[in-house]
């Protein structure tokens, strides 16, 4: 096991806040594997790179020799996390939650080592909790303290409804730490209230309080708003290799350092060397290619990453392409949005038609439906389909 100083440096990499650092140092000094918990409510079936920030940190804890607990909130998922919400979230059914949970496990084990991961479901203890124990849990906190939470306070002061079951969410999440006897809990910055609840409840149940590590919310491809499927600025971890690669290579130059720190498993020394190269005149795109290849390889394998780099990622299956597939070469000074490529290649009548097709899911690149966020990278070759009958293999070359 690495020294306490080395462990602390890796643990704090990219983190927003560590509470309480002195307590964590004391835990690490004992030289015993710590129980590291992170909870995920399976409210949607697909994960994007923003979700993997926490999972990557769990992987780092595994590499340090600690015991990682991947907690699936099948019970809390039916409540709905109110964090940051201005209205009550509709609860999911048990069937929806369990179906999504199975998909989660398949995806996260592309990052975590299954042999070193304990998968837990919080329904295991919550379903067995009787009325007396539940009343004891709710007695650990007051309504006044609950209303100190920013989102609840805003809704209360603006006369927006707060359902009683929403007060239960942070209590149940906090009790998860009691049930698992967690030493450290990870969460996004928007989860700080819930994480602190875990510390408080552990003390109330006679346990040593966990330390909490908050991780930032990853910015999306625009570099401004947090990554979100609804905003279209996301990279799904199940997206086709070519699509994933193209999106990552097209991120703003300034954003790539944030992505390297939070998404890459390269050392900070290596990342700082890349930064020095760029400051010395290296092309930022060459560095983004390294990032894109690493991430594509993580989810699809080395061969898929190499193919994506060559513009050959995820070709359409034989028989789906016309025999006389047109070959089109375009030139440009920089990467181009897919709408402009389709228009310039003659697959659509005009840019407006391209935008309409993209909005309706009528555009495929290498067999995968893409939206307007897809960027055609200089040097790439893709098979493009606009509508049902317009096909072309398009290469975008540098002017």
Curated annotation (Swiss-Prot):
It is an enzyme of class 6 (ligase). Coiled coil: none annotated. It catalyses: tRNA(Tyr) + L-tyrosine + ATP = L-tyrosyl-tRNA(Tyr) + AMP + diphosphate + H(+). GO terms for cellular component: cytosol. The gene is tyrS. CDD domains: S4, TyrRS_core. Residues 336-396 form the S4 RNA-binding domain. Keywords: Aminoacyl-tRNA synthetase, ATP-binding, Cytoplasm, Ligase, Nucleotide-binding, Protein biosynthesis, RNA-binding. Catalyzes the attachment of tyrosine to tRNA(Tyr) in a two-step reaction: tyrosine is first activated by ATP to form Tyr-AMP and then transferred to the acceptor end of tRNA(Tyr). This is Tyrosine--tRNA ligase.
């Amino acid at each position: 096991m690495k020294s306490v100083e080395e462990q602390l440096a890796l643990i704090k990499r990219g983190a927003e806040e560590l509470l309480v650092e002195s307590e964590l140092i004391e835990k690490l000094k004992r030289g015993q594997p710590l129980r590291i918990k992170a909870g995920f409510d399976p409210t949607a079936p697909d994960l994007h790179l923003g979700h993997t920030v926490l999972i990557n940190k769990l992987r780092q804890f595994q590499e340090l020799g600690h015991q990682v607990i991947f907690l699936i909130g099948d019970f809390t998922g039916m409540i709905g996390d109110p964090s940051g919400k201005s209205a009550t979230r509709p609860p999911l059914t048990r069937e929806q939650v369990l179906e999504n949970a199975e998909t989660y496990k398949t995806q996260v084990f592309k990052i975590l080592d299954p042999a070193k991961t304990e998968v837990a479901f919080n329904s295991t203890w919550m379903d067995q909790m009787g009325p007396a124990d539940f009343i004891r849990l709710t007695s650990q906190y007051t309504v006044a303290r609950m209303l100190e939470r920013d989102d609840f306070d805003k809704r209360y002061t603006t006369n927006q409804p707060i359902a009683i079951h929403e007060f239960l969410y942070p209590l149940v999440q906090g009790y998860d730490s009691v049930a698992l006897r967690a030493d450290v809990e990870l969460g996004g910055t928007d989860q700080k209230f819930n994480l602190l609840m875990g510390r408080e409840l552990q003390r109330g149940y006679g346990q040593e309080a966990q330390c909490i590590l908050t991780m930032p919310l990853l910015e999306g491809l625009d570099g401004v708003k947090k990554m979100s499927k609804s905003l279209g600025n996301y990279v799904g971890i199940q997206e086709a290799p070519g699509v994933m690669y193209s999106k990552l290579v097209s991120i703003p130059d300034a954003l790539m350092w944030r992505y390297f720190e939070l998404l890459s498993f390269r050392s900070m020394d290596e990342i700082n060397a890349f930064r020095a190269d760029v400051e010395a005149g290296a092309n930022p795109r060459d560095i983004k290619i390294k990032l894109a290849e690493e991430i594509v390889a993580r989810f699809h394998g080395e061969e898929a990453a190499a193919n994506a780099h060559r513009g050959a990622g995820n070709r359409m299956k034989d028989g789906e392409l016309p025999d006389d597939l047109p070959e089109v070469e375009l030139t440009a000074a920089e990467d181009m949005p897919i709408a402009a490529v389709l228009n310039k290649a003659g697959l659509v009548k005009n840019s407006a038609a391209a935008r309409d097709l993209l909005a309706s899911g009528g555009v495929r690149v290498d067999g995968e439906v893409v939206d307007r966020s897809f960027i055609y990278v200089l040097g790439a070759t893709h098979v493009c389909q606009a509508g049902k009958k317009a096909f072309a293999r398009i290469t975008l070359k540098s002017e």
